[in-house]
Amino acid sequence: MEQVHHLTTRNDNFLCIPPLYHTGAKFHWMGSLVAGSKAVLLKGSKPRDILNAVSNELCTIVWLLVPWAQDILDELESGSINLQDLNLSQWRLMHIGAQPVPPSLIKRWHRFFPNHQYDTNYGLSESTGPGCVHLGINHTDKIGAIGLPGYRWQAKIVDSNFNPVPVGNVGELAVKGPGVMSCYYNDPAATAEVLKDGWLLTGDMAKQDTEHFIYLVDRKKEEKGVSR
């Protein structure tokens, strides 16, 4: 899915910074495998380490978390790092996710990287990670939204009776697609609470605008722990 969402080709080079126990890291990396392109695993997340890796390895796609992007911008704004010392012309896409993204952050980012494409997406472990909802690289006018249903995914906002809510109203985000889990291990009661006719109730409260872009509002529940 990430290969489709990011238009990844064999000429791309993906910089993976999060640890591979994170589903997002694994499945973003899988996009490179599907495309037959290069991927770089980076140990550490300091601004200079990230930018040096992009420069030295000629990375074209970088997945950042909000704190890492903020740290990079702080270093650039303070003058501690000079972009003229780095080879970053091939870097085309800044992908950011795993938490709400402030629109002000992306505006700051584009002051330093005006030619960067931007994308964010949404997912959870029960949906096999990211991609069930994503913004898309052509929708920078919708920064602040998590986006539209991803490739081969459906999404809707429902009330406590699993009925769709009107546009603009807050309800629980439900998703349906090829990555939805089969069950919680050894816990049929918990499984029945979140799986409804193939739909996964995410526990995230959200709303849609008139163009069907989805915005996260709040968290309904905490993560499910799994034990033997």
Residue ranges and their predicted role:
Residues M1-H5, F14, I50-A53, A69-E77, ...:
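Adenylate-forming
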Residues A98, G123, G147, D204, ...:
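Active-site glycine-centered loops adjacent to acidic/histidine catalytic or metal-binding residues
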Residues G36, V54, V62-L65, F162, ...:
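Residue-level signal for inorganic ion chemistry
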Residues V34, C59-L64, L73-D141:
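Gly/Ser/Thr-rich phosphate-binding loop
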Residues N163-G168, E172-R228:
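Conserved ATP-binding/catalytic segment of the ANL
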Residues I81-L86, Q154-K156, M205:
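Generic short beta-strand
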Residues R10-N11, W91, D197:
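Phosphate-coordination loops involved in phosphoryl transfer and adenosine-cofactor binding
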Residues M1-N13, Y21-I61, E75-L76:
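Conserved AMP-binding/adenylation subdomain of ANL enzymes
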